[in-house]
Amino acid sequence: MVMTAEAKAKVIEEYQTKPGDTGSPEVQVALLTARIKYLTDHFKTHKKDFHSRTGLLKMVGQRRNILKYLKSKDVQRYRDLIARLGLRK
């Protein structure tokens, strides 16, 4: 696993909507974003790691689907999350 338990707990604590929340779209997107950022840095030094690149593409697609779901359910939460994570410019 890429993230340590402490780093994962920190991300969950920052983005949870209520105590003990680990499955809300905000938390899921934040965890995927942290893993995507790590892998992006990883590819700067390991340019030929194509196996991990396929995993990265799956994570990006999964994050896109969760964001699309959140946008269809609650646009304001979607916009807040995008702003907090700095995804769209």
Swiss-Prot record:
This is Small ribosomal subunit protein uS15. Keywords: Ribonucleoprotein, Ribosomal protein, RNA-binding, rRNA-binding. One of the primary rRNA binding proteins, it binds directly to 16S rRNA where it helps nucleate assembly of the platform of the 30S subunit by binding and bridging several RNA helices of the 16S rRNA. Belongs to the universal ribosomal protein uS15 family. CDD domains: Ribosomal_S15p_S13e. Transmembrane segments: none annotated. It comes from Maridesulfovibrio salexigens (strain ATCC 14822 / DSM 2638 / NCIMB 8403 / VKM B-1763). Pfam families: Ribosomal_S15. One of its GO terms (biological process) is translation. Part of the 30S ribosomal subunit. Forms a bridge to the 50S subunit in the 70S ribosome, contacting the 23S rRNA. The gene is rpsO. InterPro entries: Ribosomal_uS15 (IPR000589), Ribosomal_uS15_bac-type (IPR005290), uS15_NS1_RNA-bd_sf (IPR009068). GO terms for molecular function: rRNA binding; structural constituent of ribosome. GO terms for cellular component: cytosolic small ribosomal subunit.
